[in-house]
Structure formats: structure tokens, C-alpha cells
């Protein structure tokens, strides 16, 4: 019998997947000499890319265009890697997954494809690594200010 999950028992991160090329790019940021003190991990890096992709309507349009015109051309059997993401950014992925552009009669893309596209679109921006690390710090500050600090 299924039991209701208590909100207090929810994990702060959710596991998803990212296609291998974008995962490798995130790994490069993780290993970057610019990622220090604190050294941000994959949930931070992926969440920053998602936050950037959904930051405003222009970025959201860029994300959807990328999914429809670029990601759709890739081999759907492309290797993926597991990657955690913070819950608030996973909610953004879920909202996009349920969006009208991804609903009948349109083609349906999986959450991992949308997460991958968030990384790909972030990667295309002008100083991409610095932009992602700035967003990581903004997300970290927001998490800490809402009582979700690492000390809780």
C-alpha cells in the first residue's frame, strides 16, 4: 500500500539525466580553477543552467527553439549520465515538460532532453562558465535565505 510522502522527508535534490556532451561540459566547469571556495557540485551546476534557461521569456524561447531544432536532430540513443538537480529547478523542468509546446499534438520530449537543452543553451551564451558560476552563487544564496542552508 502506498503511503503519503511527508514533505519534511523530501530530498532536497532529484535525480535526472543529462546527455553525455553536456554532462562533460558540466564536468569541465566542476574541475575548472574558477570553481573554488566553495567548490560547487553537479546539482549546483545543472540547477544554474536550468535557472538561466528559464530566467526570462527570451531565454525560454531560445530553449524551446533549441529542443525543437537542434536536440531533435541528435541520436535519441545518445549516452546519458545521472545528475542530481535541486528541487526548485526540477520543478521548472516539470513545468516545461507539461508545457503546451511539449503536449499533444506536438512531439513529446523527456525531462532529460529538456535538462540537456538547458545546459546546451547556457553553453552557447557569451562567457558561459562565468555566467553559470554567477547563477550558482545566486541560487546558493537564495537557498540559504529561505532556510534551506547546508546547516539545516
Roles of regions detected by a PLM:
Residues 1-31, 65-97, 140-152:
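Short Lys/Arg-rich basic patches
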Residues 31-34, 100-104:
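Short, recurring structural edge motifs at helix starts
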Residues 14-54:
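Short, highly charged
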Residues 37-65, 106-139:
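Short, basic amphipathic alpha-helical segments that act as recognition/interaction helices
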Amino acid at each position: 500500500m502506498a503511503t503519503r510522502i511527508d514533505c519534511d522527508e523530501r530530498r532536497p535534490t532529484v535525480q535526472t539525466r543529462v546527455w553525455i556532451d553536456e554532462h562533460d561540459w558540466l564536468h569541465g566547469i566542476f574541475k575548472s580553477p574558477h570553481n573554488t571556495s566553495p567548490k560547487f557540485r553537479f546539482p549546483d551546476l545543472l540547477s544554474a543552467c536550468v535557472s538561466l534557461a528559464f530566467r526570462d521569456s527570451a531565454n525560454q524561447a531560445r530553449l524551446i527553439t533549441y529542443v525543437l531544432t537542434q536536440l531533435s536532430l541528435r541520436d535519441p540513443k545518445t549516452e546519458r549520465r545521472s545528475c542530481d538537480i535541486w528541487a526548485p529547478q526540477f520543478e521548472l523542468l516539470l513545468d516545461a515538460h507539461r508545457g503546451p509546446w511539449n503536449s499533444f499534438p506536438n512531439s513529446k520530449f523527456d525531462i532529460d532532453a529538456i535538462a540537456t537543452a538547458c545546459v546546451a543553451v547556457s553553453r552557447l551564451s557569451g562567457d558561459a562558465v562565468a555566467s553559470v558560476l554567477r547563477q550558482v552563487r545566486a541560487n546558493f544564496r537564495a537557498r540559504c535565505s529561505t532556510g534551506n542552508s547546508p546547516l539545516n
